[in-house]
Every structure is written in structure tokens, then in C-alpha cells.
A protein has these predicted regions:
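HEAT/HEAT-like alpha-solenoid repeats
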Residues: 10-13, 17, 21, 42-46, ...
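Well-ordered alpha-helical segments within folded domains of soluble proteins
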Residues: 52-63, 106-121, 163-177, 212-226, ...
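Solvent-exposed loop and edge beta-strand segments that line ligand/cofactor-binding
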Residues: 1, 38-54, 94-110, 152-165, ...
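Loop-centered beta-sheet repeat module
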Residues: 145-220
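Low-complexity, Ser/Thr/Pro/Gly-enriched N-terminal "stalk/linker" regions
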Residues: 1-45
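Extended ligand-binding groove/face enriched in aromatic
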Residues: 54, 63-176
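Terminal, non-catalytic domain-edge segments
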Residues: 1-15, 22, 66, 123-126, ...
């Protein structure tokens, strides 16, 4: 197994069954709700928090799928077999169903759970089929949360951290298309167009903020390539990011700087470098080969990838519990495999 992927898998194995330290996002309705992470979340109790545990499991699946028969295959399979069981998922579903938890992990953790589901659905392997069947009840719960949330979301959430809506819409859309959930696909496409079709002059020069791990501008552009026909997307991108260079330069977008990698908030900027890189590649992939912006998009992506992957070293758990998932999404080109835009039947569109 090549570097750095072996390092990433090792980092996932080091955290998916590591209960502490742990930051729980938990509403207590009574004394009985004061429980340990493993009691609250029988499957996703590791990796410091619920969403990181979910994408840690996704990372193991992704690396098993893209790099089979590596030295860590047995350990990764055993960890997934232990955690992704019907019994454990029943506990996760019960947690979601309890009073006061309608907004639990919305939307970031929900998006990663659907990404895990999409990965398992795509992989033609007996292990994937076993794990996919196990998480199916939680998949249904989470996709239903999207359905109840999006009609009531009046405005996009344009921030660079967990609550950002563009990232969650993109991953949710990828799952809906893979799962054949036309209702959710239509809802996400309609909401994305309503939020963003008229957006202009995104202020990317103001990015990043001091604790970002997602670029508001680039994640929106990465979403919209999924929901617009190619010609429409070209015109939209011209207006949305009009200053992308056409000379092949990379210096138009400078990577984020982390001065203290032991600070759980400040280390977010290592993540923004990784997620910027995959978004830049996604935007470039949506442009025709002759588009002169492609070179500058890919040059900036390469710089961000180099800086970002170097930061994924596991030296501190503040970044070690999650950065490898971002790096895996990037280096395995997961985003470039997103199901393509397609015209939806009119009867499927929300009124």
C-alpha cells in the first residue's frame, strides 16, 4: 500500500474504536441521558466526535475498495465488522429518534453518513453488501432528516465549518443519485438552484476565515457543477468567480496557514487546504478541455494538495482524528466520481 494512503488507514484504525477523548454533541432530557459515548453511539463512538467517527469508517471502506489486499486489510475489515452491525445501528437510530435531537449532526454528520452509504452501495463486494445492509436503517433515518430539514431552510448557510449547506447538499445529492432516491435528488437540486443560481462575484479573496475547513465559494461551485447542465454551469461560473486566472498560475489562491496544530479549531485550516484542492479539481473537471481556466484551477489544486497532505501526520489528535478522511477524499479523487448531472422528470420536481 503506497504512502500516504497507508498512513491514512493507520490513522483511521487508531481512532474508530478509540472512545476517549470525546466531544459529544448531546442534549440531556434527564439524568438517564448522562451516558458514555459508547452507550450513546454503539457504532460511531470513536474519533473524538460522531461525524469524525462516521467519516473515519467511510475512509476505511474507501481505502479497502480502492486499494484491496493491502497489509491493513484484515484489521480494517475486522474494525468495520465490529462496528457496522444491525444491533449497533439500532442503537444509533434510537438515539436519533429521542426527543430533542431533530438537529443532531445536521447537516455535516448527516452528509458523511450518506457518503458512507453511497460508497458501500457502489462497491460490489460481499463485505460492502453486509455493511450496507447493516447501516440501511440509519441511512433511511438520515435521508428523512434531509427531507424534513430542507423545505424549512430559508437561506443557504455560507460558512466554512460544519453547518455549511453547500457541502451537505453536494454529498446528499451524490447519495440520492446512487440510491435512486429521485424525491431527495429533486429536493436538493431545487434547493441548490433556488439558493445559488443567481449568485455573483463570490468574495474568495476574503477567504479563509481563521477556523475554516471548507471554502464557502469553492464548495458552492463544486455543488453547482452537480446540479447545472454544462453550458449553464460555464455561464454561472463566469459570473460567480470571474477572476479565475487564464494564465496557468497558482498564486491566485494561497493555502491556509496553521500556526498551532494542537489547537482543535486552528488546525481546521489544514483541512481547508485539502477540501479546496478537491473542489478546485471538481470545478476544473466540469470545464471543457480548451477552457483556459483549467490550468490555473489545477495548479492551485496541486499546491493545496501538497501542503494539505503534508499536514496529515497524526502528530496531534486535534487534527489526527479527522484530517486523513479529507486527504483520502482528495487523493482517491472521490469527488470526481460523483454521479453526473441529469435532467429530472418534471413530475419529480417539488411544487
Amino acid at each position: 500500500m503506497p504512502e500516504p494512503e497507508a498512513r491514512f488507514m493507520t490513522m483511521a484504525l487508531d481512532c474508530v474504536q478509540r472512545e476517549y477523548p470525546n466531544k459529544i454533541s448531546h442534549v440531556l432530557a434527564s439524568d438517564a441521558d448522562a451516558q458514555t459515548p459508547r452507550e450513546l453511539h454503539p457504532a460511531f463512538y470513536g474519533c473524538f466526535d460522531w461525524h469524525s467517527s462516521v467519516h473515519g469508517h467511510w475512509m476505511l471502506v474507501r481505502l479497502l475498495r480502492t486499494m484491496p489486499d493491502n497489509a491493513l486489510t484484515q484489521a480494517a475489515t475486522a474494525a468495520l465488522d465490529a462496528n457496522l452491525t444491525l444491533e449497533n445501528m439500532a442503537g444509533e437510530v434510537a438515539y436519533f429518534a429521542a426527543e430533542g435531537r431533530a438537529a443532531f449532526e445536521r447537516p455535516y454528520g448527516l452528509a458523511w453518513l450518506l457518503q458512507l452509504g453511497a460508497e458501500l452501495r457502489e462497491w460490489d463486494d460481499p463485505r460492502a453488501q453486509r455493511w450496507s445492509a447493516a447501516i440501511a436503517p440509519l441511512e433511511r433515518t438520515v435521508s428523512d432528516r434531509y427531507r424534513s430539514w430542507l423545505p424549512n431552510l430559508a437561506y443557504p448557510i455560507r460558512i466554512g465549518t460544519h453547518n455549511q449547506s453547500a457541502f451537505a447538499l453536494a454529498l446528499g445529492l451524490d447519495w440520492a443519485r446512487e440510491a435512486g432516491d429521485v424525491e431527495l435528488e429533486s429536493l436538493i437540486v431545487t434547493k441548490a438552484m433556488g439558493f445559488h443560481a443567481e449568485d455573483r462575484n463570490c468574495p474568495i479573496g476574503y477567504e479563509p476565515s481563521g477556523e475554516d475547513f471548507l471554502s464557502p465559494c469553492l464548495m458552492e461551485a463544486d455543488l453547482m457543477r452537480r446540479v447545472m447542465p454544462a453550458a449553464d454551469y460555464l455561464a454561472w461560473l463566469d459570473a460567480f468567480l470571474p477572476d479565475i486566472p487564464r494564465n496557468g498560475s497558482a498564486d491566485w489562491l494561497v493555502p491556509g496557514i496553521v500556526l498551532d496544530a494542537s489547537d482543535g479549531k486552528l488546525v481546521h485550516l489544514d483541512g481547508v487546504n485539502l477540501s479546496r484542492a478537491w473542489a478546485l479539481e471538481g470545478i476544473a473537471a466540469a470545464l471543457p478541455p480548451e477552457d483556459t481556466r483549467r490550468a490555473s484551477l489545477l495548479a492551485a489544486a496541486a499546491v493545496h494538495e501538497e501542503v494539505g497532505t503534508e499536514s496529515v501526520n497524526g502528530e496531534d489528535y486535534a487534527g489526527g482524528h479527522w484530517l486523513a478522511s479529507f486527504a483520502t477524499y482528495l487523493v482517491t479523487r472521490r469527488g470526481l466520481q460523483a454521479p453526473a448531472w441529469r435532467a429530472l422528470p418534471e413530475e419529480s420536481l417539488p411544487e
